[in-house]
Swiss-Prot record:
InterPro entries: Ribosomal_bL35, Ribosomal_bL35-like, Ribosomal_bL35_CS, Ribosomal_bL35_sf. This is Large ribosomal subunit protein bL35. Belongs to the bacterial ribosomal protein bL35 family. GO terms for molecular function: structural constituent of ribosome. It comes from Brucella abortus (strain 2308). Disulfide bonds: none annotated. It comes from the Bacteria. Pfam families: Ribosomal_L35p. Gene3D superfamilies: 4.10.410.60. GO terms for biological process: translation. Keywords: Ribonucleoprotein, Ribosomal protein. GO terms for cellular component: cytosolic large ribosomal subunit. The keyword Repressor does not apply. The lineage of its organism: Bacteria, Pseudomonadati, Pseudomonadota, Alphaproteobacteria, Hyphomicrobiales.
Length: 66
């Protein structure tokens, strides 16, 4: 059986923590900030932990746990 390859797109966007959770940047901060509330902009700063269902999918793209 061939070696499992890591999806390059997932490698650039997600990180797996030591406890196995998946971290990602918050969405919706590329443009159009003028119509967003200040609370949204503050909350979208930094990274967030994905939900379990989403994390399960992302972990399939990262077989080596990058």
């Amino acid at each position: 059986m061939p070696k499992m390859k890591t999806k390059s797109a997932a490698k650039k966007r997600f990180k797996i923590t030591g406890t196995g959770k998946v971290k990602a940047a918050a969405a919706g901060k590329r443009h159009g900030m003028i119509k967003r509330s200040n609370k949204f902009i503050r909350d979208a700063r930094g990274t967030m932990v994905l939900a379990d269902a989403d994390a399960k999918i992302v972990k399939q793209f990262l077989p080596n746990g990058l």
